[in-house]
């Protein structure tokens, strides 16, 4: 039995499948310290809220309705209307229900978008996806139907006090040409916790407009929900921007509900793709979200429960790291949002891929940084000096993991002398 080219491409071992397998193995391995995956925190107050909400929905028959009926291929009409109204009212955006489509998780939204705007055209030209600020999300790297669909730009690195640093878009060397089909940024960024500034975003928007290509913003952690963002950042949308959101980081990753906000032409295309690939998006997540909007809970919980929880967790985690790893051993990307810390082990004598294997052997899972630079034009040592860690677990788990990390860093340095 042999596979097609499509089959060959999508059965290869990719960074994202490896990550998900490690996550799964770790969840089943007693004592494993999971600092690798992207699972959001199970915040007690949110768990209680969802429990009550689902109980109410069962009693009123709304849960049964959502599970026993198909929604349309654009997604639940009631949610499209409620969400458009909320965004118009709260952010002043000129949005109607026909500017929104739902997908089965934002991972599938990106698969649709990358292959809509990049790849082979009718005239034979091949367009690419430009990531103007690498490192960028691991799950993008293999989502193209064509090979080599992605181009990443190296960032400028700003060194900050207290052993922190921040990546910025290097506009001076940013190349947008005939071959660029779309620009894509996550804000806040998974893996680094970086939030590109309002000024950088407006500049990217202007460049995208100038070249007649869309700017796609992955807003999985951003404002107005789930609000896991700790710096001042103004949400941006206009008809040339495709904004992607999700219910996962509210604490509902199992609902697999992605949200795309775009101009009507793009929404029509996404709706058609939904119909062909999955008939319709799942209904239970959207039904829950409808209730959350109607009860005025969606933005309230994002602001008063979710954001403060993660902010406290990230501060605790940085304090733990600094107890074991001084600035000369480990720099930390300024944590401006998302659920990860990005650690830079400058001049480390081993690669972070080797470090990952050593940590894994000791029951600690983190993600090596080289996976987050898809399509860099030339090798860059920095890509092998960074690791992503999830700061969501309990502080005692974080401490146990960081202690082992520090031991392995010291061991690597000792071996090099």
Curated annotation (Swiss-Prot):
Its EC number is 2.6.1.66. It is an enzyme of class 2 (transferase). Its cofactor is pyridoxal 5'-phosphate. Keywords: Aminotransferase, Cytoplasm, Pyridoxal phosphate, Transferase. Its main location: cytoplasm. Belongs to the class-I pyridoxal-phosphate-dependent aminotransferase family. This is Valine--pyruvate aminotransferase. The gene is avtA.
């Amino acid at each position: 039995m042999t596979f097609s080219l499509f089959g060959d491409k999508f059965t290869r071992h990719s960074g994202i499948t490896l990550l998900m397998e490690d996550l799964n193995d770790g969840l089943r391995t007693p004592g494993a310290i999971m600092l690798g995956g992207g699972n959001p925190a199970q915040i007690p107050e949110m768990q209680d809220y969802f429990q009550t909400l689902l109980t109410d929905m069962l009693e009123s028959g709304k849960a049964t309705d959502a599970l026993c009926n198909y929604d349309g291929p654009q997604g639940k009409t009631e949610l499209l209307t409620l969400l458009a109204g909320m965004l118009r009212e709260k952010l002043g955006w000129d949005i109607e229900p026909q500017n929104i489509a739902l997908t089965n998780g934002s991972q599938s939204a990106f698969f649709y978008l990358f292959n809509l705007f990049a790849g082979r055209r009718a005239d034979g030209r091949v367009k690419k996806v430009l990531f103007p600020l690498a490192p960028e999300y691991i799950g993008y790297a293999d989502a193209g139907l064509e090979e080599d669909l992605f181009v990443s730009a190296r960032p400028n690195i700003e060194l900050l006090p207290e052993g922190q640093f921040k990546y910025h878009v290097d506009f001076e060397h940013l190349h947008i040409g005939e071959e660029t089909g779309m620009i894509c940024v996550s804000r806040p960024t998974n893996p680094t916790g970086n939030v590109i500034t309002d000024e950088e975003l407006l500049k990217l928007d202007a460049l995208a407009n100038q070249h007649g290509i869309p700017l796609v913003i992955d807003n999985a952690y951003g404002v107005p929900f789930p609000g896991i963002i700790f710096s001042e950042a103004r949400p941006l949308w206009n008809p040339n921007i495709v904004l992607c959101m999700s219910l996962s980081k509210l604490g509902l990753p199992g609902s697999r509900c992605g949200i795309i906000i775009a101009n009507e032409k793009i929404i029509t295309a996404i709706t058609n793709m939904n119909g062909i690939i999955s008939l319709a998006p799942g209904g239970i997540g959207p039904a829950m979200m409808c209730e959350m909007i109607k009860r005025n809970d969606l933005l309230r919980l994002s602001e008063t429960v979710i954001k403060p929880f993660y902010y406290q967790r990230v501060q605790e985690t940085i304090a733990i790291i600094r107890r074991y790893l001084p600035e000369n051993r480990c720099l930390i990307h300024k944590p401006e949002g998302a659920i990860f810390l990005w650690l830079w082990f400058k001049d480390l004598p081993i690669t972070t891929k080797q470090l990952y294997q050593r940590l894994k052997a000791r029951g600690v899972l983190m993600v090596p940084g080289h996976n987050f630079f898809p399509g860099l034009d030339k090798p860059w040592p920095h890509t092998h000096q960074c690791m992503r860690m999830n700061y969501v677990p309990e502080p005692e788990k974080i401490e146990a993991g960081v202690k082992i990390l520090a031991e392995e860093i010291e061991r690597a340095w000792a071996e090099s002398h």
